[in-house]
Regions:
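Localized chelating/binding microdomains
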Residues: 49, 86, 132
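Generic detector of well-ordered alpha-helical segments enriched in charged/polar residues
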Residues: 9, 13, 17, 21, ...
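Extended oligomerization regions of viral-like shell subunits
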Residues: 162-251
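N-terminal "assembly arms/tails" that initiate or stabilize quaternary assembly
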Residues: 1-83
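A generic secondary-structure signal marking the coil-to-beta-strand transition
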Residues: 46, 88-90, 172
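Intrinsically disordered, low-complexity boundary segments flanking structured domains
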Residues: 32-40, 70, 74-81, 158-163, ...
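Short acidic, glycine/tyrosine-flanked loop/strand segments centered on an H-E-D-like triad
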Residues: 75-104
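Alpha-helical scaffold segments that mediate packing/assembly in large oligomeric complexes
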Residues: 96-169
Length: 251
């Protein structure tokens, strides 16, 4: 009996969607909400939301007897823009006769392909998010701390957190390469608490309660300088990275 291709594709998609929904929920919780992955499609090529920008220096010291000129503050809006990125998979060849010969149900192939696609899709979402975060933070010199001249230490992470001043307590997570975390271990940072493990993504916690999201995302390693590989480590607050799945994963 020939296995219906439409049914096969539907089963593959159902398994992929169910698997990724479950693992996204676990990942979001384990990462402290610093990286939020979710299945929430939006219309059009962009999602644009406006919000009022915080006004600095609203309270001032005044001279009760003065008559000087005051400089007014302006209420401004800022835009939160999300860009839709298309993703898909190569066509996957499947021979039902192989399963009939071995007396197995061809539906097993749909299940296994769906599970593999879910893992690959989640990794792609994370890599794309990290690529954007590295570019965004890298263009803000005030939020960068260069410790590439020495092996990574917890002191270096603390110096990076200090860039945020009294807002450093808002940091929820460090996103770092596996090479960096191993060097931190070599420098006496010991932590056996493993919160989440998923296809090359590990989440552990530092002494201040910030979690370490360990993944070998391509943009966490930079070999472009010609003087060896430098590793990027991101300190993230809650909802620093939000990735919506567009629910349009096609071949």
């Amino acid at each position: 009996m020939a296995f219906d291709l439409q049914v096969f594709n539907a089963q593959t998609r159902d398994v992929m969607t169910e698997t990724i929904d479950q693992d996204i929920a676990k990942f979001n919780e384990a990462s402290g909400g610093a990286i939020v992955l979710m299945n929430k499609p939006f219309e059009g090529d962009f999602s644009i939301e406006a919000a009022f920008q915080a006004i600095g220096g609203l309270v001032r010291r005044r001279d009760a007897y003065g008559s000087g000129t005051l400089t007014p503050k302006r209420l401004k809006e800022m835009l939160d823009v999300a860009v839709k990125v298309a993703a898909g998979t190569e066509p996957i060849e499947f021979e039902p006769g192989q399963y009939h010969w071995t007396l197995r149900n061809p539906e097993l192939a749909a299940i296994k392909i769906g599970e593999q696609l879910a893992k690959a899709r989640m990794a792609d979402m994370l890599n794309a998010a990290i690529r954007c975060a590295v570019a965004a933070i890298g263009n803000n010199a005030a939020m960068k701390h260069d410790a590439s001249s020495a092996a990574p230490t917890f002191n270096a992470l603390n110096a990076g957190a200090a860039k945020m001043g009294d807002r450093s307590g808002a940091l929820r997570a460090w996103v770092l390469h596996s090479t960096t975390i191993h060097n931190l271990y070599d420098n006496a940072l010991t932590n056996a608490e493993r919160l989440f493990t998923y296809e090359g993504i590990n989440v552990v916690r530092d002494p201040f309660g910030r979690v370490f999201v360990v993944t070998d995302a391509p943009d966490l390693a930079d070999s472009s300088g010609g003087s060896g590989t430098k590793y990027n480590t991101l300190g993230l607050v809650e909802n620093a990275i939000v990735v919506n799945d567009s629910n349009d994963f096609n071949a």
